[in-house]
Protein backbone atom coordinates (compact mmCIF):
# COMPACT_ATOMS: atom_id res chain seq x y z
CA UNK A 1 0.00 0.00 0.00
CA UNK A 2 1.51 3.35 -1.02
CA UNK A 3 1.59 6.42 1.20
CA UNK A 4 -1.01 8.06 -1.08
CA UNK A 5 -3.42 5.17 -0.47
CA UNK A 6 -2.90 5.07 3.30
CA UNK A 7 -5.77 5.82 5.65
CA UNK A 8 -6.28 5.13 9.35
CA UNK A 9 -8.53 2.16 8.61
CA UNK A 10 -5.68 0.73 6.53
CA UNK A 11 -3.37 0.64 9.55
CA UNK A 12 -2.79 -2.54 11.48
CA UNK A 13 -2.83 -2.36 15.29
CA UNK A 14 0.90 -1.65 15.62
CA UNK A 15 0.83 1.14 13.02
CA UNK A 16 -2.26 2.74 14.55
CA UNK A 17 -0.78 2.71 18.05
CA UNK A 18 2.50 4.16 16.75
CA UNK A 19 0.59 6.99 15.07
CA UNK A 20 -1.35 7.79 18.24
CA UNK A 21 1.84 7.71 20.32
CA UNK A 22 3.57 10.05 17.85
CA UNK A 23 0.91 12.72 18.40
CA UNK A 24 0.84 12.33 22.17
CA UNK A 25 -2.44 10.40 22.53
CA UNK A 26 -3.01 8.12 25.51
CA UNK A 27 -2.87 4.36 24.85
CA UNK A 28 -6.56 3.82 25.64
CA UNK A 29 -7.57 6.09 22.76
CA UNK A 30 -6.84 3.22 20.35
CA UNK A 31 -9.75 1.13 21.64
CA UNK A 32 -12.05 4.16 21.70
CA UNK A 33 -11.28 4.84 18.04
CA UNK A 34 -11.75 1.17 17.09
CA UNK A 35 -15.17 1.25 18.74
CA UNK A 36 -16.21 4.35 16.82
CA UNK A 37 -15.09 2.87 13.50
CA UNK A 38 -16.23 -0.75 13.73
CA UNK A 39 -19.21 -0.53 16.11
CA UNK A 40 -20.61 2.93 15.39
CA UNK A 41 -19.52 3.24 11.73
CA UNK A 42 -18.60 6.94 11.94
CA UNK A 43 -17.83 8.81 8.74
CA UNK A 44 -15.17 11.18 10.08
CA UNK A 45 -13.00 12.02 13.09
CA UNK A 46 -15.35 14.78 14.24
CA UNK A 47 -18.08 12.24 15.10
CA UNK A 48 -15.93 10.62 17.81
CA UNK A 49 -17.59 12.38 20.71
CA UNK A 50 -15.40 11.13 23.55
CA UNK A 51 -12.12 12.21 21.93
CA UNK A 52 -10.62 15.58 22.96
CA UNK A 53 -11.04 18.30 20.34
CA UNK A 54 -7.29 18.84 20.07
CA UNK A 55 -6.77 15.11 19.33
CA UNK A 56 -9.52 15.17 16.70
CA UNK A 57 -7.83 18.17 15.08
CA UNK A 58 -4.43 16.46 15.11
CA UNK A 59 -5.84 13.30 13.56
CA UNK A 60 -7.85 15.22 10.96
CA UNK A 61 -4.71 17.07 9.87
CA UNK A 62 -2.55 13.94 9.98
CA UNK A 63 -4.52 11.26 8.15
CA UNK A 64 -7.80 10.51 6.41
CA UNK A 65 -10.07 8.11 8.30
CA UNK A 66 -11.60 6.14 5.40
CA UNK A 67 -9.80 4.93 2.25
CA UNK A 68 -13.01 5.32 0.23
CA UNK A 69 -15.30 8.24 -0.46
CA UNK A 70 -18.88 7.96 -1.74
CA UNK A 71 -19.19 9.83 -5.04
CA UNK A 72 -22.63 8.83 -6.27
CA UNK A 73 -25.72 6.99 -5.01
CA UNK A 74 -28.35 5.49 -7.35
CA UNK A 75 -31.76 4.71 -5.88
CA UNK A 76 -33.38 6.03 -2.72
CA UNK A 77 -33.09 4.62 0.80
CA UNK A 78 -36.73 3.50 0.51
CA UNK A 79 -36.06 1.28 -2.52
CA UNK A 80 -35.00 -2.37 -2.09
CA UNK A 81 -31.76 -1.77 -4.01
CA UNK A 82 -29.24 1.07 -3.92
CA UNK A 83 -26.00 1.30 -5.89
CA UNK A 84 -22.98 3.22 -4.57
CA UNK A 85 -20.04 4.57 -6.55
CA UNK A 86 -16.92 4.91 -4.41
CA UNK A 87 -13.71 6.77 -5.18
CA UNK A 88 -10.44 5.32 -3.88
CA UNK A 89 -7.56 7.46 -2.63
CA UNK A 90 -5.75 6.69 -5.89
CA UNK A 91 -8.67 8.22 -7.82
CA UNK A 92 -10.27 5.04 -9.18
CA UNK A 93 -13.98 4.20 -9.03
CA UNK A 94 -15.59 1.03 -7.71
CA UNK A 95 -19.20 0.00 -7.09
CA UNK A 96 -21.10 -1.63 -4.23
CA UNK A 97 -24.78 -2.55 -4.00
CA UNK A 98 -27.07 -2.60 -0.95
CA UNK A 99 -30.03 -4.98 -1.29
CA UNK A 100 -32.85 -5.30 1.23
CA UNK A 101 -35.39 -8.13 1.40
CA UNK A 102 -37.87 -9.03 4.13
CA UNK A 103 -35.51 -10.90 6.42
CA UNK A 104 -32.07 -10.07 5.06
CA UNK A 105 -29.98 -7.15 3.93
CA UNK A 106 -27.10 -8.01 1.62
CA UNK A 107 -24.15 -5.96 0.43
CA UNK A 108 -22.45 -6.82 -2.85
CA UNK A 109 -18.85 -5.60 -2.77
CA UNK A 110 -15.99 -5.19 -5.25
CA UNK A 111 -12.55 -6.78 -5.01
CA UNK A 112 -10.76 -5.09 -7.93
CA UNK A 113 -10.83 -1.95 -10.03
CA UNK A 114 -11.84 -3.35 -13.40
CA UNK A 115 -11.47 -7.05 -14.22
CA UNK A 116 -9.20 -9.23 -16.31
CA UNK A 117 -11.64 -12.11 -16.86
CA UNK A 118 -13.47 -10.50 -19.81
CA UNK A 119 -16.95 -12.01 -19.51
CA UNK A 120 -18.87 -10.75 -22.54
CA UNK A 121 -22.07 -10.03 -20.58
CA UNK A 122 -20.36 -7.98 -17.84
CA UNK A 123 -19.95 -4.18 -18.03
CA UNK A 124 -16.83 -4.25 -15.84
CA UNK A 125 -15.01 -6.31 -18.48
CA UNK A 126 -14.90 -3.28 -20.80
CA UNK A 127 -12.66 -1.50 -18.27
CA UNK A 128 -9.97 -4.15 -18.38
CA UNK A 129 -7.95 -4.83 -15.24
CA UNK A 130 -6.64 -1.75 -13.43
CA UNK A 131 -5.67 -2.78 -9.89
CA UNK A 132 -6.42 -4.99 -6.93
CA UNK A 133 -8.17 -3.43 -3.95
CA UNK A 134 -6.34 -3.85 -0.66
CA UNK A 135 -8.17 -5.58 2.18
CA UNK A 136 -9.20 -2.35 3.88
CA UNK A 137 -10.66 -0.88 0.70
CA UNK A 138 -12.82 -4.00 0.56
CA UNK A 139 -13.77 -3.73 4.25
CA UNK A 140 -14.50 -0.01 3.96
CA UNK A 141 -17.31 -0.67 1.48
CA UNK A 142 -19.10 -2.60 4.23
CA UNK A 143 -18.37 0.09 6.85
CA UNK A 144 -19.91 2.81 4.69
CA UNK A 145 -23.00 0.75 3.90
CA UNK A 146 -23.43 -0.27 7.55
CA UNK A 147 -23.68 3.44 8.35
CA UNK A 148 -26.14 4.18 5.56
CA UNK A 149 -28.40 1.11 5.69
CA UNK A 150 -31.74 1.44 7.47
CA UNK A 151 -31.49 -2.27 8.28
CA UNK A 152 -28.71 -4.32 9.83
CA UNK A 153 -26.57 -5.96 7.18
CA UNK A 154 -26.89 -9.74 7.40
CA UNK A 155 -25.04 -11.04 4.32
CA UNK A 156 -21.98 -10.11 2.27
CA UNK A 157 -21.31 -11.28 -1.28
CA UNK A 158 -18.08 -10.76 -3.22
CA UNK A 159 -19.89 -10.33 -6.53
CA UNK A 160 -19.10 -6.72 -7.43
CA UNK A 161 -16.35 -5.48 -9.73
CA UNK A 162 -13.41 -7.81 -10.26
CA UNK A 163 -12.58 -11.50 -9.93
CA UNK A 164 -12.12 -12.21 -6.20
CA UNK A 165 -9.82 -15.19 -6.75
CA UNK A 166 -7.41 -13.04 -8.78
CA UNK A 167 -7.03 -10.95 -5.62
CA UNK A 168 -7.11 -13.99 -3.34
CA UNK A 169 -4.86 -12.79 -0.51
CA UNK A 170 -6.69 -9.49 0.06
CA UNK A 171 -10.15 -11.03 -0.37
CA UNK A 172 -9.49 -13.75 2.20
CA UNK A 173 -7.91 -11.21 4.57
CA UNK A 174 -10.98 -8.97 4.25
CA UNK A 175 -13.42 -11.88 4.63
CA UNK A 176 -11.64 -13.09 7.77
CA UNK A 177 -11.72 -9.56 9.22
CA UNK A 178 -15.44 -9.24 8.48
CA UNK A 179 -15.96 -12.59 10.17
CA UNK A 180 -13.70 -12.29 13.22
CA UNK A 181 -13.65 -8.54 13.87
CA UNK A 182 -17.05 -7.37 12.64
CA UNK A 183 -19.13 -10.37 13.62
CA UNK A 184 -20.46 -11.59 10.27
CA UNK A 185 -20.93 -15.36 10.33
CA UNK A 186 -18.64 -17.12 7.85
CA UNK A 187 -21.65 -18.82 6.24
CA UNK A 188 -23.13 -15.36 5.58
CA UNK A 189 -20.11 -14.38 3.47
CA UNK A 190 -20.13 -15.67 -0.12
CA UNK A 191 -17.16 -15.44 -2.48
CA UNK A 192 -18.00 -15.77 -6.17
CA UNK A 193 -15.53 -16.80 -8.87
CA UNK A 194 -15.71 -17.07 -12.64
CA UNK A 195 -13.73 -20.28 -12.29
CA UNK A 196 -10.12 -19.81 -11.16
CA UNK A 197 -9.44 -23.52 -10.75
CA UNK A 198 -6.22 -23.40 -8.64
CA UNK A 199 -7.86 -21.03 -6.15
CA UNK A 200 -10.99 -23.19 -5.85
CA UNK A 201 -8.69 -26.02 -4.83
CA UNK A 202 -6.71 -23.71 -2.54
CA UNK A 203 -9.76 -22.45 -0.64
CA UNK A 204 -10.89 -26.06 -0.23
CA UNK A 205 -7.54 -27.03 1.26
CA UNK A 206 -7.47 -24.03 3.60
CA UNK A 207 -10.96 -25.00 4.77
CA UNK A 208 -12.38 -21.52 5.25
CA UNK A 209 -16.03 -21.61 6.26
CA UNK A 210 -17.11 -18.99 3.71
CA UNK A 211 -19.62 -19.98 1.04
CA UNK A 212 -18.43 -20.50 -2.52
CA UNK A 213 -20.31 -19.50 -5.68
CA UNK A 214 -19.19 -20.32 -9.22
CA UNK A 215 -20.30 -18.27 -12.21
CA UNK A 216 -20.99 -21.01 -14.76
CA UNK A 217 -23.21 -19.45 -17.46
CA UNK A 218 -22.74 -22.18 -20.10
CA UNK A 219 -22.85 -25.96 -20.23
CA UNK A 220 -20.53 -26.69 -23.15
CA UNK A 221 -16.86 -25.84 -23.66
CA UNK A 222 -17.58 -24.06 -26.96
CA UNK A 223 -20.32 -21.81 -25.60
CA UNK A 224 -18.44 -20.99 -22.41
CA UNK A 225 -15.36 -19.94 -24.41
CA UNK A 226 -17.53 -17.55 -26.41
CA UNK A 227 -18.84 -15.68 -23.38
CA UNK A 228 -16.08 -16.29 -20.82
CA UNK A 229 -12.55 -16.21 -22.24
CA UNK A 230 -11.27 -17.57 -18.92
CA UNK A 231 -12.35 -20.98 -20.27
CA UNK A 232 -9.29 -20.89 -22.55
CA UNK A 233 -7.14 -21.14 -19.40
CA UNK A 234 -9.36 -23.26 -17.18
CA UNK A 235 -11.59 -25.64 -19.14
CA UNK A 236 -15.15 -26.44 -18.17
CA UNK A 237 -14.09 -29.98 -17.35
CA UNK A 238 -11.31 -28.72 -15.04
CA UNK A 239 -13.77 -26.34 -13.39
CA UNK A 240 -16.28 -29.09 -12.65
CA UNK A 241 -13.52 -31.34 -11.29
CA UNK A 242 -12.31 -28.54 -8.99
CA UNK A 243 -15.88 -28.02 -7.77
CA UNK A 244 -16.18 -31.74 -7.04
CA UNK A 245 -12.86 -31.59 -5.18
CA UNK A 246 -14.11 -28.64 -3.13
CA UNK A 247 -17.30 -30.46 -2.18
CA UNK A 248 -15.58 -33.72 -1.23
CA UNK A 249 -12.94 -31.83 0.76
CA UNK A 250 -15.31 -29.50 2.65
CA UNK A 251 -18.73 -31.22 2.39
CA UNK A 252 -20.20 -27.78 1.68
CA UNK A 253 -22.60 -27.11 -1.19
CA UNK A 254 -21.62 -24.71 -3.97
CA UNK A 255 -23.92 -22.12 -5.52
CA UNK A 256 -23.73 -22.16 -9.33
CA UNK A 257 -24.66 -18.85 -10.99
CA UNK A 258 -26.12 -18.86 -14.49
CA UNK A 259 -26.93 -15.67 -16.41
CA UNK A 260 -29.54 -16.37 -19.09
CA UNK A 261 -28.49 -14.94 -22.46
CA UNK A 262 -31.15 -15.06 -25.15
CA UNK A 263 -30.28 -17.43 -27.97
CA UNK A 264 -26.96 -18.40 -26.40
CA UNK A 265 -27.50 -20.48 -23.26
CA UNK A 266 -31.26 -20.53 -22.68
CA UNK A 267 -32.56 -23.45 -24.73
CA UNK A 268 -34.36 -26.51 -23.31
CA UNK A 269 -31.29 -28.53 -24.30
CA UNK A 270 -29.09 -26.18 -22.24
CA UNK A 271 -31.38 -26.78 -19.26
CA UNK A 272 -31.09 -30.56 -19.64
CA UNK A 273 -27.31 -30.33 -20.01
CA UNK A 274 -27.12 -28.12 -16.92
CA UNK A 275 -28.98 -30.71 -14.85
CA UNK A 276 -26.71 -33.46 -16.15
CA UNK A 277 -23.53 -31.43 -15.56
CA UNK A 278 -24.29 -30.57 -11.94
CA UNK A 279 -26.00 -33.79 -10.87
Ranges and model annotations:
Residues 88, 113-115, 216-218:
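Short, small-residue-rich loop/turn micro-motifs
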Residues 76, 110-111, 192, 215:
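Short linear Ser/Thr-Pro motifs
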Residues 100-137:
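Canonical Radical SAM [4Fe-4S] cluster-binding loop centered on the CxxxCxxC motif
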Residues 1-105:
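Flexible, acidic/Gly-rich N-terminal and inter-domain linker regions that tether
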Residues 125-155:
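Conserved alpha-helical substructure of the radical SAM core
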Residues 146-155, 160-279:
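Conserved AdoMet/S-adenosylmethionine-binding subsite of the radical SAM
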Amino acid sequence: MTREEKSYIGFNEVEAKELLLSIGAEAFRYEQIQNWIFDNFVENWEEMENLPKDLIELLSNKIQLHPLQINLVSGSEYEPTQKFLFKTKSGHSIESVLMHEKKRTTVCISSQVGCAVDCKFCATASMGFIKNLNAYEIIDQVLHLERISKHKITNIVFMGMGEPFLNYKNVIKAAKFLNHKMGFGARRITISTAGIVPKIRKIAEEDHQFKLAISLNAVTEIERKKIMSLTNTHSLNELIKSAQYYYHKTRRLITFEYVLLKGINDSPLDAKRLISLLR
